[in-house]
Amino acid sequence: MKRTYQPSKLVRKRRHGFMERMSSVGGRRVLMRRRMKGRRVLSA
């Protein structure tokens, strides 16, 4: 059986990166919450 997590830097950036987060209202909310929490890294 193939494992579920097959890491790829490109797919990670495209799906969870900063530009992707900024492209939707929900994604911007994620960034806002992470800023409020004081996260050093906001997105992939």
From Swiss-Prot:
NCBIfam families: rpmH_bact (TIGR01030). One of its GO terms (molecular function) is structural constituent of ribosome. Transmembrane segments: none annotated. This is Large ribosomal subunit protein bL34. It comes from the Bacteria. Keywords: Ribonucleoprotein, Ribosomal protein. One of its GO terms (biological process) is translation. Pfam families: Ribosomal_L34.
